[in-house]
């Protein structure tokens, strides 16, 4: 638990020995994902498919019977995004949140209906209840579609 209503649902991967196939990680890596529990629920990224089952279990535990409203996609690289399909299959009413570069990339990885997608741009906000996310574009920090989210409630 990060705060009363922000929960870590990521997974540690101690089985991997190379990050991105080239960087040695003798202790493995962490796939970070969070869920914000508010009037509306937002999942912040997913995890690598290698740890998808554990991630979905963590998500289900955190949700405690509730259904998520949004999946915020801040980065399309597989270690952040390869469990998107599984989340959408489990929660078909979920709205995918990304920027203008996210959704064309999403279609390259998954066969998903993006009619429930919400495209955000620099400075847009998403009100969840007490929590309000502000989106900041960070292109080429790593990949061209990268964005970050700022929660004005818990900073």
Pin down the residues of each PLM region.
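Metallo-beta-lactamase
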Residues: 1-4, 98-146
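Conserved beta-strand hairpin/beta-sheet module of binuclear metal-dependent hydrolase folds
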Residues: 2-59, 148-151, 155
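Short, flexible, glycine/charge-rich loop motifs used to bind or transfer phosphoryl groups or to couple energy/partner
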Residues: 23-24, 32, 60-62, 86-87, ...
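Short catalytic-loop micro-motif centered on adjacent basic/acidic residues
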Residues: 42-45, 70-73, 135
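Active-site metal-binding motif and surrounding structural segment of the metallo-beta-lactamase
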Residues: 50-97
């Amino acid at each position: 638990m990060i705060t009363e209503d922000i929960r870590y649902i990521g997974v540690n991967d101690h089985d991997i020995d190379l990050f991105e196939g080239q960087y040695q990680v003798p202790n493995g890596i962490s796939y970070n994902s969070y869920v914000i529990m508010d009037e509306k629920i937002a999942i912040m990224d997913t995890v690598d498919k290698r740890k998808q089952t554990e991630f979905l279990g963590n998500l289900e535990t955190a949700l405690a019977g509730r259904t998520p409203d949004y999946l915020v996609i801040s980065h399309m690289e597989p270690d952040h995004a390869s469990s998107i399909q599984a989340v959408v299959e489990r929660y078909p009413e979920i709205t995918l949140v990304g920027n203008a570069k996210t959704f064309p990339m999403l279609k390259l990885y998954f066969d998903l209906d993006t009619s429930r997608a919400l495209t955000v741009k620099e400075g847009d906000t998403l009100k969840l209840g007490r929590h309000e996310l502000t989106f900041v574009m960070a292109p080429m920090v790593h990949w061209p579609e990268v964005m970050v989210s700022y929660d004005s409630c818990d900073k």
